[in-house]
Amino acid sequence: MTDNAVVYYKEKKAGLLKKTEDVYEFEYDSDYLKDAEAKPVSLTMPLTQKKYFSERLFPFFENLLPEGFLLDMTIAKLKIDRNDKFNLLQYVGQDTVGAISVKPLKEGA
């Protein structure tokens, strides 16, 4: 997995989620912001041209992750460190129950 993931709202590219050594960053896509029907990915992350920063994975995205038995099964199957929430999100975030999905950024995209 990469350290960059594309966040979609109902199949529309809403923004880019990045993980660096020190911080997580989320930025809405400029084309998404121009869409009159654009909705924020979370009430805690209103639509804005400014970037959001956090020392840990943003709570909204962390809440997309499985818990308990499902988390145990997922990390065992994928062989991902339980604390590597960003890579875990890129796997499980591709098929969520709600309107938001998170997919790894493909090279050259």
Q: Predicted regions: what is each one?
A:
Residues 1-109:
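Phosphate/dinucleotide-binding and metal-coordinating scaffold of catalytic cores
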